[in-house]
């Protein structure tokens, strides 16, 4: 009788172990299953989202085909449950485990905004407006208001004070915060250029150097021609001659310039 009980108990233990192994295999297979996406997908995880709520979001957005093993995976690997709120980028081939590790890392998706040389403020504003993951706060703001927000002296335009480049940002960053980064970058570049300038050049302040650089940039779009154009303007300044260049007039006309040829009346 005792032997029979031991035999039955042994069978039960084997069955339990087999069931546990089967469950473990299922969980592992689920964890290594690729997300159900064919292209990059942006996923927003709201603050305060719990385990069950996350499962619901993933199933709702059809990112996982079957969430049956999701909670078991989080229990088996609790470090995967430490996910952080944010906006993330999921890529094709990413597995459920890799996705959870990304959410736990807090490494949010990076987006880009590209500003090209020679752009006017309205061009920068258009790029910002088209960047859908930015927080838009500048709508309806005048140049003077934007300049004030950037800490640019009254009476000066933001143009020329913003460094053209491709900037990365995370979802929720404000447009003015991005402009401030471009402004700080320009200030650093200007100070470096001023420190390394030829002291024989007729510029009294870094701002005068920046103004000339902006004029030369607008005078020619060909980089190879800029040194020659700059040389001509410098020589005119040295002899007290007017620059006689359209960009200086167009800049002064601002938004009133309609694209027509500049004449003596201007």
Question: What is each model feature region?
Answer:
Residues 1-244, 249-251:
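Conserved catalytic or metal-liganding residues and their short signature motifs at active sites
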Residues 265-266:
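Conserved small/polar residues in nucleotide/adenosyl-binding loops
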């Amino acid at each position: 009788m005792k032997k029979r009980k031991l035999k039955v108990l042994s069978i039960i233990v084997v069955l339990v172990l087999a069931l546990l192994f089967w469950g473990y295999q299922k969980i592992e297979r689920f964890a290594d299953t690729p997300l159900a996406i064919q292209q990059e997908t942006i996923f927003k995880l709201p603050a305060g989202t719990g385990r069950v709520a996350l499962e619901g979001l993933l199933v709702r957005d059809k990112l996982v085909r079957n969430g049956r093993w999701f909670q078991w995976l989080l229990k088996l690997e609790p470090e995967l449950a430490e996910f952080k709120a944010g906006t993330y980028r999921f890529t094709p081939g990413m597995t459920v485990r890799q996705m959870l590790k990304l959410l736990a890392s807090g490494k949010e998706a990076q987006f880009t905004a590209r500003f090209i040389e020679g752009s006017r403020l309205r061009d920068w504003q258009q790029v910002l407006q088209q960047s859908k993951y930015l927080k838009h706060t500048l709508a309806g703001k005048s140049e003077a208001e934007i300049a004030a927000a950037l800490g640019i002296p009254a009476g000066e335009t933001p143009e020329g004070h913003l460094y053209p480049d491709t900037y990365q940002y995370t979802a929720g960053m404000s447009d003015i915060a991005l402009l401030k980064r471009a402004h700080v970058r320009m200030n650093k570049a200007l100070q470096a250029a001023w420190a390394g300038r030829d002291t024989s050049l007729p510029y009294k302040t870094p701002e005068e150097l920046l103004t000339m650089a902006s004029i030369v940039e607008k005078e020619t779009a060909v980089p190879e021609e800029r040194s020659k154009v700059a040389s001509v303007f410098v020589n005119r300044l040295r002899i007290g001659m007017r620059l006689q260049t359209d960009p200086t007039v167009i800049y002064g006309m601002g938004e009133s310039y309609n694209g027509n040829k500049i004449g003596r009346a201007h």
